[in-house]
UniProtKB/Swiss-Prot annotation:
Domain of life: Bacteria
Function (record text): Part of the ABC transporter complex LolCDE involved in the translocation of mature outer membrane-directed lipoproteins, from the inner membrane to the periplasmic chaperone, LolA. Responsible for the formation of the LolA-lipoprotein complex in an ATP-dependent manner.
Gene coding for it: lolD
Binding-site residues, ATP: 42-49
Keywords attached to this entry: ATP-binding, Cell inner membrane, Cell membrane, Membrane, Nucleotide-binding, Translocase, Transport
N-terminal signal peptide: none
Name listed for the protein in its UniProt record: Lipoprotein-releasing system ATP-binding protein LolD
Pfam families, per the entry: ABC_tran (PF00005)
Annotated membrane topology: Peripheral membrane protein
SMART domains with a match to the protein in the record: AAA
Keyword Transport: yes
Annotated GO MF terms: ATP binding; ATP hydrolysis activity
Assembly description: The complex is composed of two ATP-binding proteins (LolD) and two transmembrane proteins (LolC and LolE).
Length: 228
């Protein structure tokens, strides 16, 4: 049986606005094994992005537990959670969040360049390899403003992979792309998941795109729902 690399146990998330409390996540549990590709599908406001932020250590649950690589993750201090994120997780968002003043190569290399033990030559080679893998070997020196939307998202994918994460978390990674480009990105994600033997969790509102995953979870009003 494959190792469980990401797990949520009975997770709740409440937000308080003045005297009122809004329940966004209502007791969700989830297990993702190494090499598994899971899609979470739900409409806007269903709580799927909030759950992804909790699983990625960007937010903390009101109640419940999160485990990363079989170790408790949600109760760590902010600095230690940040260290674990950089060590085990890769993130891709609907908006690419590339730094506009840096080239594609520099953007991809950035996560490793920030580490104390950086070997600059090796980092550059690794970034070049990943850009080649996502079909952008001819765009190494181009800045984000010189790339198409699909190309920018491919750079973001390469950047998320450069640290060889155990888990890739993607929040509506094709939300800003046309249909053909979106399917191409999902196909690439599936291929990269196999190549790097990493777990992948993607949230999307698009049922058709989600079919690429090994399993699909449907979310509504902060709960899993049966969609059979």
């Amino acid at each position: 049986m494959s190792k469980i690399v990401l797990e949520a146990k009975d997770v709740y998330k409440h937000f308080t606005d003045g005297k009122s409390t809004v329940e966004v996540i209502k007791g969700l549990s989830l297990k993702i094994a190494a090499g598994e590709f899971v899609s979470i599908v739900g409409a806007s406001g269903s709580g799927k992005s909030t759950l992804l932020h909790i699983l990625g250590g960007l937010d903390q649950p009101t109640q419940g537990q999160v485990f990363l690589n079989e170790q408790r993750f949600d109760n760590l201090g902010e600095a230690e959670r940040g260290f674990k994120r950089n060590q085990y997780l890769g993130f891709v968002y609907q908006f690419h969040h590339l730094l506009p003043e840096f080239s594609a190569l520099e953007n991809v290399a950035m996560p490793l360049m920030l580490r104390a033990d950086t070997n600059y030559k090796e980092v550059k080679q690794q970034a070049e390899h990943l850009l080649d893998r996502v079909g952008l070997s001819h765009r190494l020196t181009h800045k984000p403003g010189e790339l198409s939307g699909g190309e920018r998202q491919r750079v973001a994918l390469a950047r998320a992979l450069v640290a060889r994460p155990a888990v890739m978390l993607a929040d509506e990674p094709t939300g800003n792309l046309d249909r053909k480009t979106a399917f191409g990105i999902f196909e690439l994600l599936s291929d990269l998941k196999q190549e790097f033997n990493m777990a992948m969790l993607i949230v999307t509102h698009d049922e058709q795109l989600a079919q690429s995953a090994d399993s699909i979870l449907h979310m509504q009003d902060g709960l899993w729902v049966d969609h059979s």
